[in-house]
UniProtKB/Swiss-Prot annotation:
It catalyses: Endonucleolytic cleavage at a junction such as a reciprocal single-stranded crossover between two homologous DNA duplexes (Holliday junction). Belongs to the RuvC family. Mg(2+) 1 binds at residues 8, 140. The keyword Secreted does not apply. Homodimer which binds Holliday junction (HJ) DNA. The HJ becomes 2-fold symmetrical on binding to RuvC with unstacked arms; it has a different conformation from HJ DNA in complex with RuvA. In the full resolvosome a probable DNA-RuvA(4)-RuvB(12)-RuvC(2) complex forms which resolves the HJ. The gene is ruvC. Its cofactor is Mg(2+). Binds 2 Mg(2+) ion per subunit. This is Crossover junction endodeoxyribonuclease RuvC.
Amino acid sequence: MAIVLGVDPGSLKTGFGLVNHVSGRCEYIASGVIRMKSSDELPERLKTIFESLVEIIECYQPSEFAIEKVFMAKSAGSALKLGQARGAAIVAAVTNGLPVGEYEARKVKQSVVGSGAADKSQVQHMVRTLLHLTATPQEDAADALAIALCHINTQASLIRLAGSRQFRRGRLV
């Protein structure tokens, strides 16, 4: 059993999603969006991200943490803010002893939808379908759940690969 906390970072909205991986099945636990006030200074928003994620970690006790990597942004300032939001989230995870998996947006979409070029509505639809949800999750929450599902799929693939192949000095034999 592994509970994975997926996070879609942002300086104004940070999505989170928790998925339980049991016996090859994925079960929805919870999801939501941490909202910050645009009027707050960036350090205050980063504190909100950190404290909210620590609270979520303490409440749900996930065993693994997955987050989206920084991708191209509209501006250098946006990229820096996104990087700082990621940093606050990652520090919340490592402070609580969680291993961190990082995934590019294209890999997440490929893993969940089957296309790295999928749009937000396709991700929402597949997350709803894969987790048997009765309602469509908000965009940021759906992205976070997709990140958790990508992490689960990636880890399962690595375990299968390690069990079926032999490596010597880091190379496949």
